[in-house]
């Protein structure tokens, strides 16, 4: 009898968690604005620009008919610095810094101008292929984070 009660409570708990209708904030594609144009500095980091552009293309396609339209201009940079070295002078830890300076325009008027910087520290790897793959994953994650911050700043602009 005791095991039966525990199982029932467990099942009810799982059912209540699954039915809470949690959705991430950026999965909702019903924003009150549209993205008219996204432009990137030609000297910016191509991989970072591609990731940010792909993330905003989703918003741009869904919200094409909105009255409020914004244009976004982005300049991205990437730096890799050596944080620590071993006794031989070989790098042990790296820091990858991804930054973006972005401007949001509405009717050709600047309404927001900000700088975002995201950092990640990681260990060196003797296998350079794995190190390069790890760096690509880190760059993608930092770039997604930056695009989420840009989108959040536009959402808060539109709420005001």
Across the structure, where does each feature detected by a protein language model lie?
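Sec-dependent bacterial lipoprotein signal peptides
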Residues: 1-20
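Bacterial Sec signal peptide processing site at the extreme N-terminus
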Residues: 16-37
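Short hydrophobic beta-strand segments
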Residues: 34-43, 71
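Short extracytoplasmic
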Residues: 42-58
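Surface-exposed short loop/turn segments
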Residues: 54-59, 63-64, 73-140, 144, ...
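Short Gly/Ser/Thr- and Asp/Glu-enriched loop/turn motifs at secondary-structure junctions
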Residues: 67-69
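Amphipathic, coiled-coil-like alpha-helical scaffolding segments used for oligomerization/assembly
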Residues: 157-160
